[in-house]
Amino acid sequence: MKILLTGSTGYIAQRLLPVLLANRHEVVCCVRDRNRFNFEKYNSPSISVIEVDFLKPETLRAIPVDIDAAYYLIHSMSTSTGDFEKMEEASAINFRDYIQQSKASQVIFLSGIINEENLSKHLSSRRNVEWILASGSYSLTTLRAGIIIGSGSASFEIIRDLVEKLPVMIAPRWLNTVSQPIAIRNVIEFLSGVLLNKNTFNNSYDIGGPDIMTYKQMLLKFAAVRGLRLWIGIVPVMTPKLSSYWLFFITSTSYSLAQKLVDSMKVEVICKENDLKGMLGIIPVSYEDAIKEAFERIELNQVPSSWKDALTSSTLYDGISKYAEVPVHGCFLDYRKRLITHPEKVLLKIWSIGGKNGWYYGDWLWIIRGFIDKLFGGVGLRRGRKNQTEISPGEALDFWRVLIADRRAKRLLLFAEMKLPGEAWLEFRIDDQNILHQTATFRPLGLWGRLYWYSVLPFHGFIFRGMIKNIADG
């Protein structure tokens, strides 16, 4: 069967895609920028990639009309823009209007659990999207999930940040809100199980794990699984804004996402009973086992997707290709080169940069820069990296975004997502003469940009000099 997969670079789609291919489906992947999609790693003739932006109806003509079903996995929660509800509504309308002209008999939509009239903006937007999709001429199957637990999921990584960094927590009262977490493995089983299953047509289902817990209990259970001590005190007067700052400064989330999460976490998300898991033969994974499975993936360096790879920079929203061509004019440069004797070792070191491995020189200065970035509302250094030795275009790498990761050409190009009065690139390249080239490029924005460059210039002298030396030494 021919399946359309939207949001193909996203957390859920990257987990679902290998399952669809294993089930011998032909999959058409929709992406805004094909350079963010690592096509080669799948090595399958059953996959094709098309560039589609559902906010731009004219781009939808790239979608083939002979599809049998479509997954709607488009989500605007991570965007920094304030009108994400309008973006989600427009995307859903454009999707519906085009898909109902195709041969698709089913659309599958992954939403959030909706069981209260007083919904958060996020859940209200999800419900509105469901209504729009349900008005199409195809059959809609909606799966509503709560907290998703898996390596790289937003909920898992935020809980991990809190538990591993704060042995004592003074926390807001929404930690007493009840939720029903679900393992990412079960989510994928449900998504693949309902595909072209006529018993699920024009139905909606809440999906969750076997455990109903407060967020406080989830944190304590996580600590117990990891063998960590944790004490949590609840403060009833912590405002939503203060709660958002609490999440923002302690975890790797952006402030805009923290606001939306706090808004949603005040609402109980408990599944309404249904027979879907019995119909599909799915065995729910406990919260504890979901945590253990996530860490098994992390320890084996097998994290196929991460929520941190979602674009948080409005600058890059239209695609990374535009910034893959590093500007030459009107820029400041810090360029260094060094002859190397072991290019493969050096290349491995370049491909392992950031995250737990650090930046090979002056890590404490990078940490300070990341902290300053957080203070000004940036992403900071806490995003780390998904895989310790592999890297792909579009991935987040601390406060950088990977633009080019071409191992054959021995070139890595990064774009800064930190708060800056301008735009910055960092490039590593090994040429045919075994010379390592390291170039930091900064395109200033006005007078403040120029003042910024000269203020950090003294630090560049020894940071970049030490960095290239330690990389070149292999």
PLM segments and residue spans:
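NAD(P)H-binding glycine-rich loop region in Rossmannoid oxidoreductase-like domains
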Residues: 35, 39-102, 112-118
